[in-house]
Amino acid sequence: MKKVLFLINPASGKLVGQNLKDCIISELDGVLDSGLYDIEYSARDIETQYDNYLSNYEIVVVAGGDGTISQIVNVIAGLERKPKLGIIPIGTGNDLANSIGILHLYKSQGLGALLKIILECKIVKIDILSLDNKFIFSNYLGIGSDAKISSDFDRLRHRPVFREIRSCISNKGFYGLLTLKNIFYRIPFDVEIRDENEHSATEITSLNSGIREIVITNTKIYAGMELSSKCRMDDGKFEVTVIRSMWEWIHLLFAILRRRPLDTITRNLMQFQTNRLELNFTGDTFCQIDGEKYDRPCRGEKRLLVNVITSCEVIIP
């Protein structure tokens, strides 16, 4: 069994992944024998590319953003022998890496220091969630305005005009423009929420049409901000936050600027923890999982079920 597989998304960030392979080889020279690791570029369909293959390694290091990591977590969740997960955060969204301290280490100390930490292999367990037992994720699920932004980004990023814009501004800058474009988007139907409380009783909440978004999070950081001061990634629970008004949506910006969790600055915020959530609605809206669009779960008459299904080991500083 080999020790490490480095899996690089060549399209991550501003194509940083295309040059990363040589940097990894250089940093590992004299540190780890070349026969103990492999470096590969990921295909778009990672789940098919690496199904039942990752168990051949002790550690799988993903160089990419939250979307790439989510695809690998999807594979790891189904394995009997799960490798440890390492992260080189080079994506547009790096919320998981930010939540566990890897992003700060990478930005402040560089690739060499990060590879050393990965080889030391200090780990923490994080919960893995599923949507309808079909879509597996570790970070967050968004329904509404944030998913509309992700959908627009995915639709536009493959067009030639996007390459022109990308040469002038960063992906995050482009996300900012799309945020302004979708500032008035609302979920156009009523939503019923059923969740299991700490006493294993079912609570039912009805939300009228016109709310901005529903965000289900397992990570401490979501879109660069903290939503909940109570978040733990290994407690078998996840946080549910409902952004009902424009004012609460503006508070998301305050949370970023003030570097404080949203629940500490927004009065009467609808937020709770659970290990099982059911959403019932009839209508069409947008859905994103770990920053990637998933429109299919949010069309027509729907009953969506979110629950914790397993966990995986992630390397931390």
Please annotate each region the language model reported.
Residues 1-63, 70, 74-77, 111-116:
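ATP/NTP phosphate-donor binding region
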Residues 5-7, 16, 78-213:
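Catalytic core of DAGKc-family lipid kinases
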Residues 13-17, 222-224, 313:
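Short N-terminal binding/cap micro-motifs at the start of the first secondary-structure element
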Residues 18-20, 73-76, 98-100, 227-228, ...:
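Short amphipathic alpha-helical segments
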Residues 65-68, 90-93, 143-144, 219-221:
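Short glycine-rich anion-binding loops that position phosphate/pyrophosphate groups of nucleotides
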Residues 142, 146, 215-228:
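Glycine-rich phosphate/pyrophosphate-binding beta-alpha loops
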Residues 196, 216-221, 243-247:
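Histidine- and/or cysteine-centered catalytic micro-motif in compact active-site loops
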Residues 201-208, 227-317:
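ATP/nucleoside-binding phosphotransfer catalytic cores, i.e., glycine-rich phosphate-binding loops
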